[in-house]
From Swiss-Prot:
Gene Ontology terms: cellular component: chromosome, centromeric region; cytoplasm; glutamatergic synapse; kinetochore; microtubule plus-end; nucleus; postsynapse; presynapse
The protein, known as: Kinesin-like protein KIF2C
Coiled-coil intervals: 614-652
Residue span(s) of domain Kinesin motor: 254-584
CDD domains documented for this protein: KISc_KIF2_like (cd01367)
Annotated stretches, region: Globular: 1-250
Domain of life, per lineage: Eukaryota
Region (Disordered), start-end ranges: 164-188
SUPFAM superfamilies per record: P-loop containing nucleoside triphosphate hydrolases
Length: 721
């Protein structure tokens, strides 16, 4: 094989075989002795192509290279007994033998021995002078030969090959010519490397498949998201948990933002949902958000949120109350205003936390924050330091639904929110009830909760669709001393839950979102001590205006979240809203956990993730802006229409009274005529009110049409995404 390496050099033309079986000539560009291969190039279709071929393949396709091994000059000389050739003193031999022709390479010539060849002396023109040893001064000369037979003589030494090499080459040629398509070719180095890589990939896939099967046996694969459940379980094993306990100290905050996780309910357990929320410490919460990569690989994106307090599913209402609303009770005895909000998705446990344990439509009000705060109020009221203030405890309970206020303790009477001459917000007609003990408060809570507006959503069949506000008022000699407002906010997912609902539901969702945004801005303004508080943006913040102003005002927000995987999006929205209220960074907590990503090689058939481009977001934003403008216009025109109607009713004649007067058998006709004339005169004076009412109703109809059109455009855009 070393002799074959010597025959191969850059520029030599050899035959090669392509992958499709085609054999054609190509030129050698490089020879790699270490890898035992050569690189060849050829021109095809006007472009230069190349490949790498093993030396063994070259020998198999070009067997003539094995036959044309050159002989050294000394091997072509006859051996003579009386001639000794010293190795160091040999003189050069000048030869005029012509170059070997290409046609002779394919000729098979065999010679037995060189000594059998007899060359006439007169035909040789080559003279070789050999040195003679010192003890013998004789000279020997090779006979010369005539020039005519030089070509025949020079062919014979160069074409000498061993019999074994000739037989091997002959068998190779005969096999290749007989079955050219079935000839076994040795593979190049690149092909061998590719096959090694392929084998490694197949081995790795087999190992991963076995690992997945083994893991699947450890988990119930009937669960829809058992892969995510396994990843979450493996992640929780690595966590160091230090949950909140009753013995932990209570910290004083002007704005306290907490989060509470509820356990999985019966519906979620029946659907075999998994818990995607972890509470590793008393102020940190993790959301294990399920994700899919582009190649449909499942993984978790663990997002961290830091709050003042974080309650897991084992925390009771008593523990939540101890760290949230209880510190605020002291504030109202010091002449301040305190507010506690329960915010979150429908079905996340807001009403359970604020009002008490729910059993169907009935509620145990004694286990809620409403009743707990009332008990503490009476305990402090009876203490010696506050006994001399002669404080009286009053309660009110009202709801805000679609921008309107209703008294839950007065047969759900509609109330008006106005500002007096001192720019104080007054809820006209709101009934305040004097209570003397906690049991009286519980009765009021049960009575008001039964009248609260509710509706059906995907998450809850009996969902509270209004903001319920329970207020505890402390008065001394008729003057307000302190006020504690406990607010159970409406669910924050209504807009997404009813994408194809009627106008009433759309207006309901728009009002809820508007009030929640206004509430966030008011709380942030309170925390940053801003001069301006945007409380006029919604009825909710307008009613609670005095809770956002003043140095002695404190607020607590309890963000309620659902742990199920189907509520993950709403849970993240709730946590982001609560995070923006106080703008706490997830990296400012004591643990300093960083978001982590976990991966598993699980392939799925499809992905439900959608994304919006910049143009689509701008178009949807403009349509949403038009929808919000139409909703605001509808609210304003509705108020104006009601005012005009109220004026007509109050100042207009009482035609019903005249009609009832005629039902009397002995009514006074003179009196009837006088009242009828007076009524007609009043009717004429009210023409401007009728005209104004007509214009307002016309504008209201146009605004409703614009709202309907904007809503259809938004829904159509969402369906096409």
């Amino acid at each position: 094989m070393e002799s074959l390496h010597a025959r191969l050099f850059p520029g030599l033309s050899i035959n090669i075989q392509r992958s499709n079986g085609l054999i054609h000539p190509a030129n050698i560009s490089t020879v790699n002795v270490e890898k035992s291969c050569v690189s060849v190039e050829w021109i095809e279709g006007g472009t230069t192509k190349g490949k790498e071929i093993d030396i063994d393949d070259v020998a198999a396709i070009n067997p003539e290279l094995l036959q044309l091994l050159p002989l050294r000059p000394k091997d072509s000389l006859p051996l003579q007994e009386n001639v000794t050739v010293p190795k160091q003193k040999r003189k050069s031999v000048n030869s005029k033998i012509p170059a070997l022709k290409e046609g002779l390479r394919s000729r098979s010539t065999r010679m037995s021995t060189v000594s059998e060849v007899r060359i006439p002396a007169q035909e040789n023109e080559m003279e070789v002078e050999l040195p003679v040893p010192t003890n013998s001064r004789k000279q020997f000369a090779i006979p010369s030969h005539p020039r005519a037979s030089c070509s025949t003589v020079t062919e014979l030494p160069l074409l000498m090959v061993s019999e074994e090499a000739e037989e091997q080459a002959h068998s190779t040629r005969s096999t290749s010519s007989a079955n050219p398509g079935n000839s076994v070719r040795r593979k190049s180095c690149i092909v061998k490397e590719m096959e090694k890589m392929k084998n490694k990939r197949e081995e790795k896939r087999a190992q991963n498949s076995e690992l997945r099967i083994k893991r699947a046996q450890e988990y119930d694969s009937s669960f829809p998201n058992w892969e995510f459940a396994r990843m979450i379980k493996e992640f929780r094993v690595t966590m160091e948990c230090s949950p909140l306990t009753v013995t932990d100290p209570i910290e004083e905050h002007r704005i306290c933002v907490c989060v509470r996780k509820r356990p999985l309910n019966k519906q979620e357990l029946a659907k075999k949902e998994i818990d995607v929320i972890s509470v590793p410490s008393k102020c940190l919460l993790l959301v294990h958000e399920p994700k899919l990569k582009v190649d449909l690989t499942k993984y978790l994106e663990n997002q961290a949120f830091c709050f003042d307090f974080a309650f897991d599913e084992t925390a009771s209402n008593e523990v939540v109350y101890r760290f949230t609303a209880r510190p605020l009770v002291q504030t109202i005895f010091e002449g301040g205003k305190a507010t506690c909000f329960a915010y979150g998705q429908t079905g996340s446990g807001k009403t359970h936390t604020m009002g008490g344990d729910l059993s169907g439509k009935s509620q145990n009000a004694s286990k809620g924050i409403y009743a707990m705060a009332s008990r503490d109020v009476f305990l402090l009221k009876n203490q010696p330091r506050y006994r001399n203030l002669n404080l009286e405890v009053y309660v009110t309970f009202f709801e805000i639904y679609n921008g309107k206020v209703f008294d839950l303790l007065n047969k759900k009477a509609k109330l008006r929110v106005l500002e007096d001459s001192r720019q104080q917000v007054q809820v006209v007609g709101l009934q305040e009830y004097l209570v003397t003990c906690a049991d009286d408060v519980i009765k009021m809570i049960n009575m008001g909760s039964a009248c609260r507006t509710s509706g059906q959503t995907f998450a809850n069949s009996n969902s509270s669709r209004s903001h319920a506000c329970f207020q505890i008022l402390l008065r001394t000699k008729g003057r307000l001393h302190g006020k504690f407002s406990l607010v159970d906010l409406a669910g924050n997912e209504r807009g997404a839950d009813t994408s194809s609902a009627d106008r009433q539901t759309r207006m309901e969702g728009a009002e809820i979102n508007k009030s929640l945004l206004a509430l966030k801005e008011c709380i942030r303004a309170l925390g940053q001590n801003k001069a301006h508080t945007p409380f006029r943006e919604s009825k909710l913040t307008q009613v609670l205006r005095d809770s956002f102003i003043g140095e002695n005002s404190r607020t607590c927000m309890i963000a309620m979240i659902s742990p199920g995987i189907s509520s993950c999006e709403y849970t993240l929205n709730t946590l982001r809203y609560a995070d923006r209220v106080k703008e706490l960074s997830p990296h400012s907590g004591p643990s300093g956990e960083q978001p982590v990503q976990m991966e598993t090689e699980v392939m799925e058939a499809s992905s439900n993730g959608t994304s919006l481009t910049g143009n689509e977001e701008e178009e949807l934003s403009s349509q949403m802006s038009s929808f919000n403008e139409a909703m605001t216009q509808i609210r304003e025109l509705e108020e104006r229409a009601l005012e005009e109607l109220r004026e007509i009713i109050q100042q207009g004649p009482n035609w019903l009274e005249l009609s009832e007067m005629t039902d009397q058998p002995d009514y006074d006709l003179e009196t009837f005529v006088n009242k009828a004339e007076s009524a007609l005169t009043q009717q004429a004076k009210q023409a401007k009110h009728f005209s104004a009412l007509r214009e307002v109703i016309k504008a209201l109809r146009l605004a409703m049409q614009l709202e309907e059109q904007a809503s259809k455009q938004i829904n159509s855009k969402k369906r096409h995404q």
